[in-house]
């Protein structure tokens, strides 16, 4: 609605209008005379604005129209990570793609690029991390972050050298939301199961 209005009408440089503003500000004298051009990127940017300002529970309702077999556990995980994912998502399709690591069933299929970094040494490190995670009493992003950083320091490893293999095992890819958010939203039991599937 917002984008369609701006195709042939303008009010200065303003791009985003509420329903009330559209009604109040619209005037026939501000309708452009030149042909309108469909700008997909601008449309996506406007869509991102509305996605960011949509409640997570409302987004979940839309997601469930496509993903009809979500369990209650998956829904809970999705609601937990949606605030992070919706910041950069421009379409519902992008959101669902970003949530695929939650929607996938175990065992998670690891893509070829991810397999390359899962060396024997990396798997040994993940095994150590798993044991530390099992002892974590309070499961949240701040405690998970501290645990992983402490491990990287104690083992004299770059953080990416533990984050990438862990991300590969938990999501099957090397690109996903922050590793802390992934661990947090999946929950301790699911994280341990996914690590065990691969190790």
Language model features: what each stretch is:
Residues 23-31, 70, 110-112, 153-155, ...:
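Short, mixed-charge aromatic SLiMs
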Residues 3, 27, 42-46, 62-66, ...:
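A general alpha-helix detector
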Residues 55-157:
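Small-residue-rich helix-loop
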Residues 14-17, 38, 54, 58, ...:
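Alpha-helix N-cap and coil->helix boundary residues
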Residues 11-14, 35, 74-77, 140, ...:
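Short, surface-exposed helix-loop/turn micro-motifs enriched in polar/charged residues
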Residues 1-51, 164-174, 186, 197-198:
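Alpha-helical recognition segments enriched in aromatics with Gly/Pro capping
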Residues 141-199:
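Charged substrate- and nucleic-acid-binding regions of tRNA-handling and nucleotidyl-transfer enzymes
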């Amino acid at each position: 609605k917002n984008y369609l209005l701006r195709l042939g009408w303008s009010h200065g440089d303003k791009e985003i209008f509420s329903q009330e503003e559209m009604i109040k500000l619209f005037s026939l004298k501000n309708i452009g005379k030149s042909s309108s051009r469909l700008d997909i990127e601008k449309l996506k940017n406007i869509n991102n604005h509305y996605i960011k300002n949509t409640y997570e529970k409302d987004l979940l309702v839309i997601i469930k129209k496509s993903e009809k077999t979500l369990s209650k556990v998956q829904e809970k995980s999705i609601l937990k990570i949606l605030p992070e994912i919706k910041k950069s998502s421009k379409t519902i399709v992008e959101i669902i793609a970003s949530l695929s690591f939650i929607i996938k069933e175990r065992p998670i299929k690891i893509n070829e690029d991810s397999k390359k970094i899962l060396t024997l040494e990396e798997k040994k490190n993940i095994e150590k991390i798993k044991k530390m995670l099992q002892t974590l009493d309070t499961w949240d992003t701040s405690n998970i972050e501290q645990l992983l950083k402490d491990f990287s320091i104690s083992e004299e490893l770059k953080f990416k050298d533990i984050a990438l293999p862990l991300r590969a095992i938990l999501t099957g890819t090397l690109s996903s939301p922050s590793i802390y958010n992934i661990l947090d939203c999946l929950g301790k039991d699911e994280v341990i199961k996914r690590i065990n599937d691969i190790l």
